Amino acid sequence: MQISNSYLQLGDDFYLPSTPRQPSNPQLFLWNQGLAESLGVADFLAQEQEDPAGFFSGGRLLPNSKPVALAYAGHQFGHFNPRLGDGRAHLLGELRGDTDMVFDVQLKGSGATPFSRGGDGLCGLGPAVREFIMSEAMAALGVPTSRTLAVVTTGDEVYRGDAVPGAVVCRVAASHLRVGTFEYFYAQGNKDAIERLCDYAISRHFPELASSEGPEKYSGFLRAVFSRQVELVCEWLRVGFVHGVMNTDNTTISGETIDYGPCAMISTYNPNTVFSSIDAMGRYRFGHQPSIAHWNMARLTECFLPLLDQDSKQATAIGESLLGEFPQNFEQRYHHMLASKTGVRLQGDSDKALCEDFLQLLRKQGLDYTNSFDSLTRSLIDPQHEDRCASQWPEWYQAWSARIEQQGRPREVVAEGMRRHNPVVIPRNHHMEAVIDECIKNGSPDAAKSWLKVLRRPYQDLPTTPNYQDPPADGDRSYQTFCGT
């Protein structure tokens, strides 16, 4: 295992050196063995006979690690801040995985940095456990996401109103390049830095563009980033995920989900669902996430206008043309996603309407999003669920059944295809809170580990799956989330 530091080659405008805080008594709380093996970390620890807690709490540095805090800006709830940066995170470097992909390794909650703006740079155990569970659940669901290698308790208390146990999260991501990273240099008028950053992003995420040059390269880069955002948000909508804080500093160039602070999962289907306590206007509500992704891509495109054409009017026209492709591409991908969830082969507007009508029924009847699609899937092979669905949605179910029959595929085959898009279990909010509370109360990760066994197989019926399928009694109407990590 060898840590590399390619980001440092971009120059010291891109980061500030920062040493992680020394924890008083680091103890491993949660460990991702599969991820550790894929990164070569498990072999390294075995050979060196080392405890992971020291390395992944900031207490010790991995060989060749040169920790830094990354510089970036960002639009937060629509308002621009020209200097944000990692205020409580340290990039340790990069590791090459078993698929030959390179991944960033970062500590969160590892102490103050030059970007902390007066904060303590620390993290409580609750938000750390949430990040581990959510990122692993999302990965198992098939959603592009950062991962969590470890949660380490520090032995120190963190004050968030009350004293809570401190923890450090070790996050692994395809990179930590953000829309806000480009905005940071655009705000300074640093065209050269944007060019270097784009070349670096291409080398990490879009090597197929490496031979492109000039405006063609930058147009291709923007299209590639747009495509990944379309895919990402469609996946969020597929599983019922509400990010909660889709600021441009949380929008990755890689197209991975990052920052699980105020996130949540919808229960009762309603596009206007919002959980974040700081999102009073509902800017980042469930059904508005595609529009926000488009808005964020507009902010990225602005950074590239000087590179798209020397003439500002022509550059703006090119940028607007590129952005104009986003809604259509999203709409196409979204309808295919929805068709996959309902088992319908899209052949016209009537099929799109059939899929949309199902969502409208769920909203009108105040039904659970995940369990309704699960029941619809089972109705093809289980008479009990068939009777239930036919009773719940008589007209729609009759039309849907006729369409499935008309397609000529065996019901078992359709059900199998639907199952790949409709999970049996998701990381429901009330279970998340209960598990976090139990972990903190008992000082033990057992509750999290038990739940993770189910969440890592979300499309299968396990003996313990029913324990986590029930929706909350009030449909999460009173549930709120808060920024934590």
From Swiss-Prot:
| Active-site residues (renumbered) | D249
Entry binding sites for ATP: G85, G87, R88, K108, D120, G121, R171, R178, D259
Tell me if Glycoprotein is a UniProt keyword of this record: no
Residues of the region (Disordered) are 462-485
> Which residues does the record give as Mg(2+) binding sites?
N250, D259
EC numbers: 2.7.7.-, 2.7.7.108
Q: Which InterPro entries match?
A: SelO
Q: Which reaction does it catalyse?
A: L-seryl-[protein] + ATP = 3-O-(5'-adenylyl)-L-seryl-[protein] + diphosphate; L-threonyl-[protein] + ATP = 3-O-(5'-adenylyl)-L-threonyl-[protein] + diphosphate; L-tyrosyl-[protein] + ATP = O-(5'-adenylyl)-L-tyrosyl-[protein] + diphosphate; L-histidyl-[protein] + UTP = N(tele)-(5'-uridylyl)-L-histidyl-[protein] + diphosphate
Q: What does this protein do?
A: Nucleotidyltransferase involved in the post-translational modification of proteins. It can catalyze the addition of adenosine monophosphate (AMP) or uridine monophosphate (UMP) to a protein, resulting in modifications known as AMPylation and UMPylation.
Q: Please name the NCBIfam families in this protein's record.
A: PRK00029.1
Query: What family, per the record?
Result: Belongs to the SELO family.
This protein is called Protein nucleotidyltransferase YdiU
Q: Source taxonomy lineage?
A: Bacteria, Pseudomonadati, Pseudomonadota, Gammaproteobacteria, Cellvibrionales
Gene designation: ydiU
